[in-house]
Structures are given as structure tokens and as C-alpha cells.
């Protein structure tokens, strides 16, 4: 592992060096710094200085920074190129019967200072162009920085291992604090990119707080970066790639022998796996491609599906355009593992309602997505005791994901799928029924909310409050769905209350926002969108593909919505008061009546209470309805 540190003070010679014709290199004095990048002329301690011209490329530079004793070449690459040309000329001379040139000497290792200074000058223009390009491509979202946000508030982020569907989610175990990596050295005035070793101080999803080796307890130059970025490498990568390791300018005079320092510091330390970047690349390959056809829920009529076409794929998230959309603006966002999308023919196979397309044949280039690419549901046995129409249960309201409501099974489909209606809110034609699988983590047996101290939303118009299941079942002549039929699996998900993450706003699924886990009930997570009121919170399963680690948006190039500011919330409040939006069934901004409004309407201010949860972060509701939009 320590072979990589030779590049800190020496350059590893190649196997062809024995044939090169350059003379032996005079070693630099041991007390000379590894690199002087303070703008002064490169000189030896005895004060000698001057200029030289490279005999290979013609570059003019400081003589002391040139390569070899004779200072004929600006870099080892020019020296070797010159030697290669000389060798070819010698062979040609032999073929022509001319006497050969003198025998080449063995090329010895060259101290880094000479090679690096000339190489830096040679690549200055290219490096500046690269910096300009990088600066132009950077996306700034109102100046939001996960690193600053976490540091200033002492937040913690959910580990990447909590998100099995995310890149590297299943192979993140080796990444931890104190792991050493090679990263670009930004504390350097050289115009070319050089590297140095840094240790992970803190992890926040894909992001890591790093500290350069040599700073010890000094945090003045600590910085955040995305571990899956292209400039992050395991220790030893620089040596294998011929890249220079240069200590930061702030501490360059701290040690006279940096190689010995690194060997001592890194003995027994962990680094990234050698194939880490390859694993990152492989984990970001997605089988869904543009022009694939799928069946997806109709966002205007939740009880049915429609055909849609994959327009784009970003980090496994699909932008689907409904096939009949002429201007291609009628779209829907979801993850490729979402339970809302299915293969063509799925609706017919299970008896689900389906909106037939007016398009009689496939458009050119469009093709059906292979069925094996879709998420598999758990097989169930419907031959014995099973769900029946009319049975009561509790379910997350798909049109108001902050609430768990009294619900009814309206239809039993094939393969374990159920059509669920929210009591008191159903349309007469059943157009707002929603399809859940029997193993879905979004449906619960009667009494789940009471046992877990979650507020259960009663049917709209139901006046006998507080709501009691026993009384309601008797009044409606209904029975509760058997508890044993529900999914009771609780994975060891690793989430903790207070953890930060990036979460899809499922009411506006094109938006991914800064969010916090505020409550955990078995496998159920309550997700709060930072900067927004609690009425916008959403109940989400721990294995939902709509949750991502901190840094996911940066990694995939998706736009992250920062926490809403006070001014934006106030403007939202003002606009909502001026214009009340009509009720719709879209996954887009629809919000039902809040608890406070329901209380005022039903009881005219009389005291009442629901079953409150044990968490201090439980939503209290609000009398004002805001429509959450992009900040």
C-alpha cells in the first residue's frame, strides 16, 4: 500500500528506463521543501538560478526546475520522448550501416520538485480552461450547502446503507470515519491539479468532512466533498496513475520528510477499495431507457392506470409522459422501483381499471418494457382466509400523505392487490380508490394507530368523537380485516429520529427536498420537509425508493430543493388566502381539511382530542392550508 507515497518525493521509473540515454540525476538538497509555490523563483539554497529551454518541446522555464543534471528537458516525459526518438534514429542508423550512438545509461528516480514545477507551468493553460468549464457547469441552489447546514446545526444524516435502492447502498460498509483517501489539494497555488491524502472526519450520506494529513487537530481547512465524486481515490492511486502528491501550502514546512510521516500515519489505516470508482459507476447504471412503455397510475383518476413512455432517467428516477400527451408536458415522476408503475398488460391481468389510449399503434421507437425490470411483490396465498370487500382497515391517504385514515376494502383483485377507499371522502364513482398490495406497508389493521399513539383521521362528517373503532364497526355493520393478513416484517433499517436525508415530495413528485426523520413506528417513517409546516409531513416506508441519502442530488445531477425560507412561506400563505384551489385527485399539491378545521366544523370549538403519539414531533395541524411549491 505504501508504494504510493514514493510520489511524494520521488518518481517511479518505468521498466524502459534502462534503455534511456539521459545522464544520472543530481539529487536535490535534503532540506529543500517538496514544492515552493509562493510565486518566488525556484532556486537551490546556494542561490543559483537561471532560465533554460527544453530541447524536446521548446518550453522556456526556470533552469533549477528543469529535469536532470544537464537541465536539457523540462520534464521526465520530454526526456523519455527525446530518448525514444534517439533510439529510433539509432536503429535506423544501424539499418543504414552507420555507427550506433553511445550506450544509454539507467535513468534514476527524480525528486518531485523538479518534475512538478515544470509540469505545472506546462499545463497551466489547460488547467485554467478546465476550471472555467467546471465553474460554468456548477449548479447553485440559493447557496444551500449540506456541509454548512449540518455543521452549523450539528445534524446527523442517515447512512447510505439505509437506502438499498440508492447507488452504493448495498456496498457502503467499508466507508467510515478515519478512512484515508487521495483528494485534490486545493491549498496550493500551482495551476495544475495535484493531490494529497485526507482522512474522513465525519460522514453525512455520500458527503464526507475531510481533513488533510499534517493538520492533526487543526480544522481550519476542513472541507466537504462527495465520496462518490470522480476526484476521490484510494490511497496508492496517485502512484499508480503517475499523479503528484503535494502537501498543502499551509503545512508544507511542518515536516522535512513527508514520506516517513505518511508511512507512520497510514500504517494500519483503512482506505477505499481499489475498485470503488468502478462500483460507483456500475451502481449508477439503470435498466430503464427512454422510449420504454409502462403502465402507471393516472394522477387525475387514481383508480385506473394509463400507458406512459419513459422520457428521461435520472438516478433511477423516471420522468414518464402519458402516451396521449401531445405537447409532452402531461408527465409523472417516480422511481423505477415504485409500486405505481407496471409492465404493459398488468392491469388486465389482475382486473385493475385501465384507460385505453386513443393511439391505435405504438409510436416509432417506443417499445414495451420487459416485465422482469419491475419491482416484484411478495407472493400471497389467497386460497384460505383472505381480504373481503367491505372489510375495514387503516391506510395512508394517497391524497394527503400526512394522515392515516379509516378505510375500506372496495374490491379484491388478483395477485394480492386491493382497491382501497378512504371513508367519508370517496367519490360516488370510485374514481379515488387506490390500489395497494396486501403486503403494502401503507395499510394497517384496525387499532394500529391507537396502539402506536398515532392520530387516526376519522371519516369526514363523522361526529362521534373521539373516534372509537368498536362503535364505528357496529354502526356500519362492518368487520375488521384480520390482523394476520397484514405485513408484519420490520427490517433493521438503521434510521433514527433526527436523521437528515433527501426526500421526494410525493404530492409534487418532481421535487426532492431537504428533509428529516421525525418519528419512527416500526418500519414507518414520518418525514418532515425542513422549513415547512408539519401539515406537509408524509408517512413513508423505510424501504421507499423515494428516500435518498444526503448528497444524492449532487451525485446524480438532480436539483435539490433547500429548506423554505420564512419569506417564501409567508408569500405562500398570502397567495393561498387570495385564491383557494379546487379539490383534485392529483399527486400535486392537494391537501385535505386539517385537524383544526375539522374540529371547528364538527364541534364548533368544543374540546376534543385524538390519540396522540409519543413523539414530540407529532403533527399538530394548522388552520391554514398552504400549497407546497418549489421555493
Swiss-Prot record:
Residues bearing the modification N6-acetyllysine: 115
Subcellular location: Nucleus; Chromosome
Biased composition (Low complexity): 564-576
SMART domains named in the record: MBT
A matching Pfam family: zf-FCS_1
UniProt keyword Hydrolase present: no
Function statement: Chromatin reader component of the NuA4 histone acetyltransferase complex, a multiprotein complex involved in transcriptional activation of select genes principally by acetylation of nucleosomal histones H4 and H2A. The NuA4 complex plays a direct role in repair of DNA double-strand breaks (DSBs) by promoting homologous recombination (HR). MBTD1 specifically recognizes and binds monomethylated and dimethylated 'Lys-20' on histone H4 (H4K20me1 and H4K20me2, respectively).
The protein, known as: MBT domain-containing protein 1
Annotated source species: Mus musculus (Mouse)
